[in-house]
Each structure stands twice: as structure tokens, then as C-alpha cells.
């Protein structure tokens, strides 16, 4: 009965393990470790557990089922029936029966291999390390053995083998725990070979010694024992890392209790932390809660007001001061008013504290008023310490502002008075109207203040009294004049010495001055006055091309050709209107080359006799003008003011932008030029003026053509040349009085600009310009050569040089 119950409880795999007789073990403990397989291959070698299956099976698996019970009963009956046989025969029979039963079973080869690998475990160590299951099975095995001994007569031998059985069961219990899960079954081939060939114990010992040392097997046995215990530990580790419900619930509970790590939860925790502190501070939990809330609500607006005050940007003294000079100065006043209103909303306690602390600080409005009353003075410490009276400084500022306003208001009347007196139609430079360019920013007026030069288009203006061109770009039409009037102008045109407050002599042409001196027959030509030929050389390229298109020609790229074509067209157009008095065959006013002069001389060959008579009249008129007294000049000036007061006159430096160089001492500034004018006037005995007008003389004022070159100078001319000023100074004045180039790209700079830019001056070109146009600006009839121009350039430190192909011929 006990055996059946044991089989039901402890059998985990009954198909693999069969029960054997427990009473008669065939081998002792000494033979358990000496068995070896017959074949050389380790796969067919049986293990010690195969040889001693009855004790090992009784230790790990309880004998269960009817098979084991029937085998026991049969064995007991055979033992009772064959008492005559000796102990050896009974043991052989039991071994044969056990072998037959083992053949029907299937054992895995892995089990035999693992047991063969570890055949010699340290038995004394396992005695102390046996598990509870092993001890329980040991007790049951002892009970079964005692029952068998009671039933059998010769159970003394069983007692002898009990200690060996217990030792083997301990060893096999340890090995079965490892190999039971690995080996699915045993093969019966090992037992068949073992019965045929025997055990071969000595050979097995050699193989076992060569196979594994004893020390290593002992350590491996300990490791196997530990692995059996580590099974549960590894399972516990997996339970910690596994997704078990209990572990997940515990983790979620701990997280919920501590608070989730999200930002929203943290913000909620921070918000809910304040009421806890307020509850701690409140003395009564229920009665004073309403009072605490009311006090919080009352303190909340005050705290908000404080925070707003702190967050507001502090206005500094520098900001207050500079705000007065900006356009949005009223914004600061509004900000001050808002600050006052915000301060009124604060509670009385806060106001009292602030007043006690800041009693010496003014209110924002009073501070702004105080700043407005102050006078800001900019200067060094020494400059500010000179005057201590604030009223004097305030009066000084008022006077400065008044003087500026008066200068702006009186600018136009002064220009009209100067125009009436024949000095300036405008000031030398005007105030800033619009910012133009770098040169105008660097320009300065007579007082030394920065100003912008007012530039007029002097394209078609030959007389001082004529109006400037219209703003729409149209060229002004001249009033028709008689050729005889032009001749009279040439006879009587001489600069008049006029000194203003600055002592500047200006060349003023008197159109009606010759009427009192000319003969009555010359006035008859005034009715047939024609317009003089305009100065095409002073026109812009765009105006020249437009005028050429008006005459029906195609636009030309060469500027000189356009000027020649326009001159011929103009002469052909106005030749029919002439009444017998031809134009003077002098140098053309456009500044063209000698070719243009020859063209004009060829057109006027028919009137060569008339030209000679006109020349004689001009010489006589010049002598008469020089002999006149100053009273006659004053009468002429009074007669001229009536005419010139109605028209704007051109100043000497009006349309020239002064390009001054700090190191250029050769070319004088306007103020230096004025002093030179005074000096030359005082030195000259003949009272010959030094004209500074930028407008050239009339065409009849100079006779420097091929026809005039043949004539010999008269004694009167030689007498006047001795009293003329230095020719070098005349060249300097002519260079400074040359009009600026009006081209946009400045491809045609003036001689003055070339000198300032240190461009090399070609002496031949410079001498040609002086003889044709330059000296005519200063009313100089003398001519200069290239060698004289070279001396003038070298004396003034100007870079100059001859042309390569014409230097030898010039010398």
C-alpha cells in the first residue's frame, strides 16, 4: 500500500523510469564507480545510474503503477519458492530480471553522457548539501527496504548495501535534477553491450582520469548543486522584470502616490502647495479661513501694483534730458502722468512709507517741469566755469537764435540790393536747401559756415543782366539786338570798379552806357538789332543733340562737330535779318579751336573794311573811357542801376563750387582772391580793373583772328600794355573763373579741377584754351605761348608737360 501511494505522489515521468526490486541490489557501493563501457565510443558507455537504477529510482521517483507491484509480488513468491538456492543465484536472477525490464525502457544518451562526465562526485560534501526532497525519499526508501527484509529471509545482504545505496541516491539525486529536463529518453543499446562485453573497470578508470580530473569534477558537482538552487532565484528575478499584474499595480500605486513626472502634474503640485502653507500659518482652521481669504484678496491688487511698478522701465536723467530734443517728447510727459495715477491707486500705508523714505525726491511731473526750466550747456569744464550767470547764457542763446532767423529773413533783400548796386545777384553761397553731394557739403560761404552753392545753368547767357534759364530746361530767348548796338558795346564795354562792404570789384556791363557817347547815326542801328549767337560750347551734350535734331540732322557723337554744325546753321538762319552790319570776326565764344575761327573769318571777308573801322572806333572809345573822371562813372552807374535792378545779375563765384585743397597755396581762396583784386587795383595807375566776372566778354571785345593777326599794334596799344597787370596773375584768375563742367560723369573736367586732382597739364592744350577762351574771361587781349605757360606751371608747382610729337617744334 505504501509503494502505490509513493508512486502517485512523486512520479513526474513514469514512462521513462521503471521501478525495480529494492530488496536485492546486485552491486555494492565499491563497484559503482569502477564500471566502464565496452565500446570505445563514449556514446554507448552506460553510466553508473544505469547500473544502479533501483536505488536511484526510489530516490527520485516513487515506484508507481501496477507493474511495479506485480513485479515485487512475483519476486517475493520466487524467493519464498526457491529458498534452496544460494544467495548468488538469487542475485543473478534479480539482475537478469532487472536487465530485461531495463531493455523495454528508453533512456536518453545525454543522461549517460552527463553521468559519465561526472562519475566521481565528492560524497561527503553531498551529505551536508542534500535537499529536503532527498531526505524524504531516503526515509521512504528505508521503510521499503525494511518491509522487503521482513518479507524475505536473506535481507542481511540488503543491510550491507544500504549505505552504498544512500550514497548513490544522493549523487544520482543531484545529477537527475540537471539531466531530467534535458534527456527525453534512454536507448537500450548501452545495456546490451554491457551484458555482452562486461564492465571493464580498469580501462574505464584510465579513461575517466584522462577525461576529467577529480578536482574539477568536485567543483562541477558544487556548481550543479548551486544551479539547482538558482532556478528559483532566476525565476524570482524574472518575476521582478516580468509584466506581472502585482508588480505593475505596485509600481502604478507608488507613482500615483508620489505624483506623475509630467509637467502638468508638477505645476499642479506647486499650485496645491500654497494652500498647505497658508493652512499652517492660519491659527484657526475653520473660523479664520474666511478672514485669511479676505486679506489675501485685499493684498492681491496691492501686490500687482507693486509688481507693475517694478517691471516698469526706470527713466534716467539722460533720457529725460534727451527727450526734450526729440519729436516724441510728449510721450515722456504722458508716461509721467500715468505713473502719478498708478501711484495714487496704492494703499495709504504704502504711500506713507514711500513718502517717509523718498521725501526729498520730487514727483515725476515736478521733475519734468524742473528739467524744462533748466538750460543745457555743452562744453568743456573750463568753458562752463567762465560764466556763472544762467541768465547771461540764456540771453546768449536767444541772441544766437535771433541772429540765425534774421540771416535767413534778410537773405533775399540783401541779394536784391546787391543786384541793384551791381555787386551780386545772390550771395556767394546760399543756405542749405537740399543736400546734394560731397563737394557741396564741404563748401563754405564768406562767413566760414557750411552751405550749398546755388548752381545756375549758364548755357546761353553771355550778358550779366540776362535771366537764368527756365526750370523746365528750355533755353531762354534773347531780346533782339542790333549789330551796331553790339559794336557800341564793344566800344564802350569796360569793367567799372565798384567796391562794396567786402571790397569786391565786379565787372558790370552797361548796355546803355554807350548811348551817351556814340554818335547819333549809330543809334539808328538799334532798331535792327538781332540776337547774338549763343555759346554752344557751354551747352550740355543732351541740349546740343536735341538742337541738332531740330535742324534736321542726325545726332552726332563728336561734340565739336555738333558745335560747328549749330554755329553754321545759326549763322545761315540769321544772315537774312542783318541790316548791313556784320558780326565781328573775332574769336568764337564757344571756345572752339582755330578751325572754327577760320570759318568765321571766311564768312566775314566781305566786311573787312567795316571791321577795320570798328576797330578804330573801339580803340578811340577805350582811350576816352580811360580819360573820364570818377564823376562820369557815377553817372553811368546810376543810369545802369535802373536797368540792372530789374534783372538778376550773376555773381563772380555763383556757379563755381570751390574745390579747395588744404595744401594748395598757389590757387587762392575767394577771400584771398578778393585781397588780390584790391592790391592790383591800388597798384595799377591806369585804374584798369581786374575783372572777376565768370561771363566772357562780347564777341566784339576781342579781336584775335587771322585777319587781326596781320595788323600791327598801334602806339596806343603799346602804351596800354605797359600798364597792364602781370600776365601770370591773369592766367591764375582765368583758371579760377572757368565754369564747371556740367556733364554727369565729369569726363570733361575744368582746368582748375585737373590741377586739384594733380592731373598732368598738357601745355599746348592749356595755352590754346587760354588764348581762345581763358584770357577772355578776365578781359585780357594778350596771348600766351606754351613756354610761358610752362614757366607759370613750374612757378606754381603744377604738373605739366609737352606733347611728345610737338615739343621740339614748339621750341
UniProtKB/Swiss-Prot annotation:
Residues 38-193, 266-312, 464-498, 579-649, 680-726 are annotated as: Disordered. Residues 281-291, 611-642 have a biased composition (Basic and acidic residues). Residues 38-49, 689-704 have a biased composition (Low complexity). Phosphorylated in response to DNA damage. CDD domains: SAP_SLX4. Keywords: DNA damage, DNA recombination, DNA repair, Nucleus, Phosphoprotein. Residues 90-103 have a biased composition (Basic residues). It is found in: Nucleus. InterPro entries: Slx4_ascomycetes, Structure-sp_endonuc_su_Slx4. Its main location: nucleus. GO terms for biological process: DNA recombination; DNA repair; DNA replication. One of its GO terms (molecular function) is 5'-flap endonuclease activity. GO terms for cellular component: Slx1-Slx4 complex. Residues 107-116, 599-609, 712-723 have a biased composition (Polar residues). It holds the Pfam family Slx4. Regulatory subunit of the slx1-slx4 structure-specific endonuclease that resolves DNA secondary structures generated during DNA repair and recombination. Has endonuclease activity towards branched DNA substrates, introducing single-strand cuts in duplex DNA close to junctions with ss-DNA. HAMAP family: Endonuc_su_Slx4. Forms a heterodimer with slx1. Belongs to the SLX4 family. This is Structure-specific endonuclease subunit slx4. The lineage of its organism: Eukaryota, Fungi, Dikarya, Ascomycota, Pezizomycotina.
Amino acid at each position: 500500500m505504501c509503494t502505490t501511494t509513493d508512486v502517485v505522489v512523486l512520479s513526474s515521468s513514469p514512462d521513462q523510469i521503471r521501478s525495480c526490486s529494492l530488496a536485492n541490489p546486485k552491486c555494492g557501493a565499491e563497484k559503482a564507480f569502477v564500471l566502464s563501457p565496452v565500446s570505445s565510443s563514449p556514446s554507448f558507455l552506460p553510466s553508473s545510474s544505469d547500473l544502479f537504477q533501483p536505488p536511484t529510482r526510489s530516490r527520485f521517483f516513487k515506484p508507481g503503477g501496477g507493474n511495479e507491484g506485480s513485479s515485487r509480488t512475483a519476486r517475493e513468491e520466487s524467493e519464498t519458492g526457491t529458498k534452496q538456492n544460494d544467495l548468488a543465484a538469487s542475485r543473478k536472477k534479480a539482475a537478469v530480471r532487472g536487465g530485461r525490464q531495463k531493455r523495454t525502457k528508453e533512456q536518453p544518451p545525454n543522461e549517460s553522457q552527463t553521468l559519465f562526465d561526472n562519475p566521481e562526485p565528492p560524497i561527503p560534501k553531498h551529505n551536508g548539501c542534500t535537499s529536503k526532497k532527498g531526505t524524504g525519499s531516503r526515509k521512504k526508501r528505508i521503510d521499503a527496504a525494511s518491509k522487503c527484509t521482513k518479507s524475505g529471509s536473506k535481507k542481511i545482504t540488503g543491510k550491507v548495501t544500504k549505505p552504498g545505496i544512500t550514497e548513490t541516491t544522493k549523487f544520482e539525486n543531484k545529477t537527475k535534477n540537471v539531466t531530467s529536463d534535458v534527456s527525453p529518453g534512454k536507448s537500450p543499446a548501452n545495456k546490451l553491450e554491457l551484458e555482452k562485453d562486461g564492465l571493464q573497470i580498469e580501462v574505464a578508470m584510465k579513461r575517466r582520469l584522462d577525461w576529467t580530473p577529480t578536482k574539477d569534477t568536485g567543483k562541477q558537482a558544487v556548481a550543479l548543486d548551486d544551479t539547482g538552487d538558482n532556478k528559483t532565484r532566476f525565476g524570482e528575478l524574472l518575476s521582478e522584470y516580468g509584466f506581472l499584474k502585482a508588480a505593475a499595480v505596485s509600481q502604478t500605486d507608488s507613482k500615483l502616490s508620489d505624483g506623475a513626472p509630467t509637467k502638468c502634474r508638477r505645476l499642479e503640485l506647486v499650485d496645491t502647495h500654497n494652500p498647505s502653507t497658508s493652512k499652517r500659518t492660519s491659527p484657526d482652521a475653520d473660523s479664520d479661513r474666511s478672514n485669511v481669504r479676505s486679506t489675501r484678496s485685499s493684498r492681491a491688487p496691492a501686490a500687482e501694483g507693486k509688481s507693475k511698478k517694478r517691471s516698469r522701465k526706470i527713466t534716467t536723467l539722460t533720457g529725460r534730458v534727451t527727450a526734450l530734443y526729440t519729436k516724441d517728447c510728449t510721450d515722456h510727459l504722458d508716461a509721467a502722468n500715468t505713473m502719478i495715477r498708478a501711484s495714487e491707486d496704492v494703499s495709504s500705508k504704502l504711500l506713507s512709507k514711500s513718502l517717509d523714505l523718498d521725501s526729498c525726491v520730487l514727483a515725476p511731473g515736478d521733475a519734468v517741469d524742473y528739467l524744462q526750466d533748466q538750460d543745457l550747456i555743452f562744453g568743456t569744464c573750463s568753458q562752463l566755469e567762465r560764466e556763472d550767470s544762467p541768465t547771461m547764457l540764456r540771453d546768449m542763446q536767444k541772441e544766437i537764435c535771433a541772429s540765425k532767423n534774421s540771416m535767413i529773413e534778410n537773405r533775399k533783400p540783401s541779394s536784391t540790393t546787391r543786384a541793384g548796386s551791381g555787386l551780386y545777384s545772390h550771395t556767394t553761397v546760399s543756405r542749405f536747401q537740399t543736400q546734394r553731394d560731397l563737394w557741396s557739403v564741404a563748401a563754405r560761404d564768406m562767413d566760414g559756415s557750411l552751405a550749398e552753392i546755388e548752381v545756375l545753368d549758364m548755357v546761353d547767357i553771355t550778358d550779366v543782366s540776362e535771366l537764368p534759364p527756365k526750370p523746365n530746361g528750355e533755353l531762354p530767348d534773347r531780346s533782339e539786338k542790333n549789330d551796331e548796338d553790339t559794336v557800341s558795346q564793344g566800344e564802350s564795354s569796360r569793367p567799372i570798379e565798384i567796391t562794396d562792404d567786402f571790397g569786391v570789384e565786379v565787372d558790370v556791363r552797361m548796355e546803355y552806357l554807350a548811348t551817351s557817347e556814340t554818335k547819333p547815326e549809330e543809334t539808328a542801328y538799334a532798331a535792327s538789332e538781332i540776337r547774338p549767337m549763343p555759346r554752344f560750347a557751354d551747352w550740355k551734350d543732351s541740349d546740343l543733340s536735341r538742337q541738332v535734331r531740330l535742324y534736321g540732322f542726325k545726332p552726332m557723337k563728336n561734340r565739336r562737330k555738333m558745335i560747328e554744325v549749330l554755329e553754321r546753321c545759326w549763322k545761315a538762319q540769321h544772315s537774312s535779318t542783318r541790316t548791313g552790319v556784320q558780326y565781328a570776326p573775332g574769336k568764337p565764344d564757344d571756345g572752339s579751336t582755330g578751325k572754327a575761327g577760320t570759318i568765321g573769318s571766311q564768312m566775314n571777308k566781305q566786311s573787312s573794311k567795316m571791321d577795320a573801322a570798328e576797330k578804330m572806333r573801339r580803340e578811340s572809345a577805350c582811350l576816352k573811357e580811360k580819360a573820364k573822371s570818377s564823376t562820369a562813372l557815377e553817372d553811368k552807374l546810376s543810369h545802369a542801376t535802373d536797368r540792372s535792378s530789374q534783372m538778376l545779375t550773376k555773381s563772380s563765384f555763383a556757379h563755381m563750387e570751390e574745390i579747395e585743397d588744404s595744401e594748395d597755396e598757389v590757387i587762392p581762396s575767394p577771400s584771398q582772391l578778393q585781397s588780390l583784386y584790391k592790391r592790383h587795383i591800388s597798384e595799377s595807375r591806369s585804374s584798369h580793373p581786374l575783372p572777376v566776372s565768370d561771363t566772357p566778354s562780347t564777341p566784339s571785345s576781342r579781336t584775335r583772328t587771322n585777319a587781326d593777326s596781320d595788323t600791327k599794334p598801334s602806339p596806343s596799344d603799346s602804351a596800354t600794355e605797359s600798364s597792364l597787370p602781370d600776365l601770370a596773375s591773369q592766367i591764375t584768375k582765368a583758371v579760377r573763373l572757368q565754369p564747371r563742367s556740367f556733364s554727369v560723369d565729369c569726363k570733361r573736367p575744368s582746368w582748375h579741377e585737373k590741377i586739384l586732382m594733380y592731373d598732368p597739364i598738357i601745355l599746348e592744350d592749356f595755352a590754346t584754351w587760354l588764348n581762345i577762351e581763358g584770357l577772355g574771361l578776365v578781359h585780357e587781349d594778350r596771348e600766351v605761348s606754351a613756354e610761358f605757360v610752362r614757366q607759370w606751371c613750374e612757378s606754381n608747382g603744377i604738373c605739366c608737360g609737352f606733347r611728345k610729337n610737338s615739343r621740339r617744334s614748339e621750341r
